[in-house]
Amino acid sequence: ITDGEYKSLAVISEDGPDQFWFVVERTIGGATKKYIELYTPEIFLDSMISYSGSATASVSGLAHLEGKTVQITADGAVHPDLVVSSGAITLNYTATDIKVGLKYVSKLTPTRYGSTSNAGTPLGKMKRWNKIFVRLDTSAIPIINGQRPPVRSPGTNFGNEEPVVSEDIEVRNLGYDLDGRIEIEQDLPLACHIVSIFGTLSVGD
């Protein structure tokens, strides 16, 4: 959760997936307020509202986010962050499908490497990932150990949505440490479906 506290949770079972409803307490404009929010796993924003209709650059109905910096997707593309003022925002361009909400960062830290070899245990030795590959399925490119590979491909024209990818994303030469840890973060309001993580690791003495 971003910028607030969970106060209550209810799970409603219906046809299809269970629904998760929360009472969330947030401070808006210096006042403490409680909101009822529905968890939607396909939406990657907190306290989100959506608009679908004729092309517009103005989104209102954001009084519950007054003064907050919000993330936005416009027709599937990430729009620069904006600050809510008078319960509204104005985009840099028009769109027909807009989602607005609070940013959160999803993080994945796999178990550290500890497999033995003919050289013995790697524990207590300096390690370096020469290459890390993260296999994605229909996902936006995440940050891998502090690096985000290029998000846009040369063939995508500006003003067009960058399609999500289903491929192996590579980062190289990540420096030495004792743990050889991998950390993957997604700070964009887009999907991040990780199929596997693999690469080449050097272990020192």
Where are these regions (language model features)?
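Beta-sheet repeat architectures centered on beta-propellers
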Residues: 1-205
